[in-house]
A protein has these predicted regions:
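Hydrophobic/aromatic beta-strand patches that form the interior of the parallel beta-sheet core
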Residues: 6, 30, 109-112, 186-188
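Short catalytic/ligand-binding loop motif for oxyanion handling, primarily in non-cytosolic enzymes
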Residues: 17-20, 38-41, 95-98, 118-123, ...
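PAPS/PAP-binding and catalytic site of the sulfotransferase fold
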Residues: 15-29, 101-105, 187-212
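PAPS-dependent sulfotransferases, especially Golgi type II membrane carbohydrate sulfotransferases
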Residues: 1-6, 157-161, 175-179, 206-279
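Conserved phosphate-donor/acceptor-positioning beta-strand/loop module used by diverse small-molecule
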Residues: 90, 101-126
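PAPS-dependent sulfotransferase catalytic domain
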Residues: 66-77, 122-207
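PAPS-dependent sulfotransferase catalytic core
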Residues: 1-73, 81, 129, 141-144, ...
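Glycine-rich phosphate-binding loop used to anchor ATP phosphates in small-molecule kinases
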Residues: 70, 74-97
Length: 279
């Protein structure tokens, strides 16, 4: 029986899938792949605002019933997948549904995984060359890889429907909510996890108020449910290795000093908030 639902969100290309797979080794914790639950909420929210029979209900009755319907539905969804007591639902979309998630359970916690934007951009760039069959564009339907590099670096961060641009756009709202509820949020930098994975996980367990679990970094389990990346038709890759490897920053070898500076200047608030040492 699911006793507690938590959320994993943040930015793409941050090793969130890997961290979820590591946590999934714990017999008390079930972690999802990319979770579709936010889309159920979106559909219910939309229909309950359109259909007369919903709107005819007393506002408070509708609110209570609506929240309880979603709360019980999410519980039932995950209990069909696992008998573990703690569930981590991974989706960047959760950042757009905080009034909902706090209404479901104010005790839920939010693991927010971030990374230097320059390395996220480098990761996307390498995926576009690794999978040339993927048709990736910035909304204008022109081949994205043919656009000038300065344009690409800007569009990754500013296109609000893109894999990085959308969660980056909602991040200030996320931080506002996190400041109001500091014990509910844990900001995990990819760089910290990369340098000190065991310490990072110990800190996560402490924050979750769970006993520490000694993970085997040489035998990282696969996700319980395989995720078919081709479906997304985008620069997405969720396969992880079975051994934890330390990564070196990519951007110093890939970007010029001018390009690196442009990413920082275009996203100054991000670097001031999370990576002031890069300024």
């Amino acid at each position: 029986i699911m006793q507690q639902l938590h959320y994993c969100l943040g930015l793409p290309r941050t090793a969130s899938t890997l961290i979820m797979n590591i946590l999934n080794e714990n017999p008390r914790i079930f972690t999802t792949g990319t979770c579709p639950m936010p889309y159920f909420i979106d559909a219910c929210k939309q229909r309950s605002n359109e259909v007369s029979e919903f709107i005819a209900l007393d506002k408070d009755v509708l609110h209570k019933s609506y929240i309880n319907f979603l709360r019980q539905g999410i519980k039932g969804w995950f209990e069909a997948m696992t008998d573990k007591p703690i569930v981590f639902s991974k989706s960047r979309m959760w950042a757009e549904y905080f009034p909902h998630t706090f209404a479901f359970d104010p005790n839920s916690k939010y693991l927010v995984i971030l990374r230097d934007l320059r390395d996220i951009i480098c990761s996307f760039e390498s995926l576009s060359w690794k999978y040339p069959q993927v048709n990736y564009s910035a909304g204008d339907n022109k081949p994205f890889h043919q656009a000038p590099v300065d344009y690409r670096m800007e569009m990754y961060c500013t296109d609000t429907m893109s894999l990085l641009g959308r969660p980056l756009h909602t991040l200030p709202h996320l931080i506002e909510v996190a400041k109001q509820n500091p014990s509910n949020f844990f900001l995990c930098k990819h760089e910290h996890f990369n340098e000190e994975p065991r310490v990072t996980l110990q800190n996560i367990y402490q924050w979750l108020e769970e006993p520490n679990f000694e993970h085997d970094f040489d035998n990282i389990p696969k996700s319980d449910y395989y995720e078919h990346d081709t479906v997304y038709r985008s620069l997405v890759y969720h396969k992880t290795g079975t051994k934890l490897k330390k990564l070196e920053p990519r951007w110093p070898k890939v970007m010029t000093e001018e390009q690196s500076r442009a990413v920082i200047d275009n996203n100054r608030w991000y670097y001031e908030t999370f990576y002031p040492e890069a300024l």
